Design a protein with these regions (language model features):
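Catalytic core of pol beta-like nucleotidyltransferases
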Residues: 1-62, 68-74, 84-155
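Short hydrophobic/aromatic beta-strand micro-patches
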Residues: 80-82
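Catalytic activation segment of kinase domains across protein kinase-like and atypical kinase folds
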Residues: 77
């Protein structure tokens, strides 16, 4: 993470973040994207997932979807997490919904969004979650937000 400028860039003409992975501090993320009650509610759900992922050893979460666009009231958020160092037994015991990627409704009920491992294959696209998250519905490239869970304090 050293050397990354931690400033979320302005949106492009389509309301998306410019191409790339944009590292942000939690406070900046909340300030930028938590600008109404709906968004703050989604952030609360995201925080629950982030606490569980950090406790299980995940180092990074990537946030995507309409939540990181100019849409004023997104329906949910989409996220994927670095699972290289995750203790899956910890998740299985403490956060089983994070391991059930097919129960999207269950994830949305608990976390108010959908969360996948970065290397989770997506349908028949031949790509994983991390790659898919960097494209819009028309498959044009766009940016996403990254939060360093190792630096993140949730107290």
């Amino acid at each position: 993470m050293l050397g990354y400028k931690r400033v979320i860039p302005e949106f492009d003409e389509n309301g998306n973040l410019p191409l790339g992975v944009h590292w942000a501090e939690w406070e900046e993320f909340v300030e930028r994207f938590g600008n109404n009650e709906r968004r703050l509610s989604l952030i609360q759900g995201l925080q629950i997932a982030m606490k569980q992922l950090k406790a299980a050893g995940s180092r990074t979460i990537y946030i995507n979807g309409s939540f990181v666009t100019t849409k004023s009231k997104p329906g949910d958020f989409d996220a994927c997490y670095d699972n290289e160092t995750v203790d899956t037994d910890c998740l299985r015991i403490n956060a089983p919904r994070l391991l059930n990627h097919y129960d999207r409704a269950g994830q949305k009920a608990k976390y108010r969004g959908e969360i996948f491992p970065v290397n989770q294959p997506v349908g028949n696209y031949g790509i994983n979650s991390f790659e898919l998250f960097q494209r819009n519905r028309n498959r044009n490239k766009k940016g996403i937000i990254a939060i360093d869970l190792m630096r993140w304090n949730y107290d």
